């Protein structure tokens, strides 16, 4: 009887299965890294927006003159967020010495993640003695969720 060399079908299936597992693991890690990058970018963007608003309107008694297009143009930043939605600015109607940064167009998962993030220097974060995130949101299914963070005095 002759002995043949080569790979058997079982060996090839085993190798392909291992490759599939490695590929799936790599995809999961890449996806997690991309989500972390987006979340970090939102944090950086909000910090830049808040700094810009305070720099542009800080000399006034309140933020009633806030205007989305003027602010985003002045700080040379797009109002688009990495999740496909927008950043929006508005004066807090109950306290004109405060303004609200809203992040819209979010999925439920992203909304929940941003809602629990510590928004340092936000009114809610400071008032709670750093025990609450400072963000408010009602996160539901779909991609129309909004996270709002209040800044100011």
Task: Give a label for each model feature.
Residues 30-36, 43-64:
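N-terminal alpha-helical signal peptides/signal-anchor transmembrane segments
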Residues 10, 41-44:
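Sequence-pattern detector for short linear motifs
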Residues 1-34:
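N-terminal single-pass transmembrane signal-anchor helix
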Residues 13-21, 39-40, 78-83:
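Short, functional N-terminal and low-complexity linear motifs
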Residues 38-41, 106:
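Extracytoplasmic/periplasmic, Sec-exported soluble proteins
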Residues 55-153:
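Periplasmic/extracellular, small/polar-rich flexible segments of pilin-like filament-forming proteins
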């Amino acid at each position: 009887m002759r002995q043949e060399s080569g790979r058997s079908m079982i060996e090839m299936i085993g190798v392909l299965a291992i490759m599939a597992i490695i590929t799936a693991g790599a995809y999961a890690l890449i996806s997690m890294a991309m989500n972390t990058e987006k979340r970090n970018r939102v944090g950086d963007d909000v910090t830049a927006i808040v700094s810009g608003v305070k720099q542009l309107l800080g000399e006034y008694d309140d933020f009633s003159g806030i205007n989305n297009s003027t602010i985003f143009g002045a700080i040379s930043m797009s109002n688009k967020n990495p999740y496909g939605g927008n950043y929006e600015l508005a004066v807090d109607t109950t306290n004109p010495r405060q303004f609200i940064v809203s992040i819209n167009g979010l999925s439920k998962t992203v909304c929940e993640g941003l809602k629990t993030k510590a928004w340092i220097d936000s009114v809610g974060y400071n008032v709670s003695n750093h025990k609450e995130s400072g963000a408010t949101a009602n996160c539901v299914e779909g991609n129309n969720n909004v996270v709002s963070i209040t800044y100011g005095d």
